Amino acid sequence: MIDVNLINGIALAFEGDAVYSMYIRRHLILKGMTKPNKLHQEATKYVSAKAQARLIALMLEEQVLTEKEEEIYKRGRNTNSHTKAKNADVVTYRMSTGFEAVMGYLHMTENLERLESLVSWCIQKVEG
C-alpha cells in the first residue's frame, strides 16, 4: 500500500472532489431535495471552485485546520494541474484544489471523524 503522505496534491484533490461532493449530495437529499435540477443548483453553492475557495479562506482565517491539513492544502494549491478552470480564475481554482486535497487526504487516511467534522463545518458556513 502506498504512503498517503507521498501522494501528490492533484491525486488527493481528485479523491477529495468526489468525497466532498458525495457528502454534499447526501446532505441535500436528506434535506428532502429530490429533483435533479434543484440538486445541481443547490450543490453548486457548496462544491463550486468559488465556494470551496471561500470555505478554505475561512478555515485559514478561523484557524480550523491542523498544521498537517494546512500543509496538505498548500501541497494541493501549489501543484500545477495543467488544467484550466471552467468558471474561476487561477487563484480561486488553485485554492479549491487545495481544499479538495485536504478532503482527499482525510479520506485516504481514513480520518473520517475529522472529515465529517470539516464537511459539517462547511455546510454550516454555506447555510449560515
Swiss-Prot record:
Q: Where is the active site?
A: 17
Could you mention a single GO BP entry for this protein?
A: rRNA processing
Q: Which cofactor does it need?
A: Mg(2+)
For this chain, the annotated S-S bridges are none
- Give UniProt keywords alphabetically: Cytoplasm, Endonuclease, Hydrolase, Magnesium, Nuclease, Ribosome biogenesis, RNA-binding, rRNA processing, rRNA-binding
CDD domains in the record: RIBOc
Presence of keyword Magnesium: yes
In alphabetical order, the GO MF annotations are: ribonuclease III activity; rRNA binding
What HAMAP family would the database entry show?
A: RNase_Mini_III (MF_01468)
Q: Please describe the quaternary structure of this protein.
A: Homodimer.
Free-text function comment from the UniProt entry:
Involved in correct processing of both the 5' and 3' ends of 23S rRNA precursor. Processes 30S rRNA precursor transcript even in absence of ribonuclease 3 (Rnc); Rnc processes 30S rRNA into smaller rRNA precursors.
Would you identify the family this protein belongs to, as annotated? Belongs to the MrnC RNase family.
Please report the name of this protein according to its UniProt entry.
Answer: Mini-ribonuclease 3
Organism equals Streptococcus pneumoniae (strain ATCC BAA-255 / R6)
| Gene name in the database record | mrnC
